[in-house]
């Protein structure tokens, strides 16, 4: 976590942040495998599986509302829902991110990239 915060600080130290037009939008905060984890036998998993459907894998977007642009940190397996969430709650139209930053090579951080291929985003 400390390495991520240092990376985040270094990345944005030279980028001017203007009040209200740029902000961080949290799209997910669960571990790579999502919530509840596959095969979970704990009580909190078994009680009500559906109540966790809006807990998405860790990802954030840095939004610039003046320019109608954003960058995405992490391309998670939940990227379809996360980009739709940005569409419905931020821009009111579907926009692709200007860039996607992957912080490290765990599967939950890059597997969403597959949705940008011909079989998903490129399909007609």
What is each PLM-predicted segment?
Residues 9-18:
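Hydrophobic h-region of N-terminal signal peptides that target proteins for export
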Residues 64, 68-72, 76-124:
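Active-site metal-binding motif and surrounding structural segment of the metallo-beta-lactamase
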Residues 20-87:
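Conserved beta-strand hairpin/beta-sheet module of binuclear metal-dependent hydrolase folds
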Residues 2-10:
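Sec-dependent signal peptide recognition
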Residues 1-2, 17-20:
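Basic/polar N-terminal segments that are highly enriched at the extreme N-terminus
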């Amino acid at each position: 976590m400390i390495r991520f915060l240092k990376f985040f600080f270094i990345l944005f130290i030279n980028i001017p942040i203007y009040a209200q037009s740029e902000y961080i939008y949290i799209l997910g905060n669960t571990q790579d495998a999502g919530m509840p984890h596959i095969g979970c036998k704990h009580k909190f998993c078994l009680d009500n599986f559906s109540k966790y459907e809006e807990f998405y894998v860790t990802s954030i977007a840095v939004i610039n509302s003046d320019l109608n642009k954003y960058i995405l940190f992490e391309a998670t397996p939940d990227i379809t829902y996360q980009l739709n969430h940005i569409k419905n709650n931020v821009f009111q139209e579907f926009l692709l991110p200007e860039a996607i930053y992957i912080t490290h090579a765990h599967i939950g951080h890059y597997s969403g990239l597959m949705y940008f291929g011909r079989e998903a985003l490129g399909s007609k």
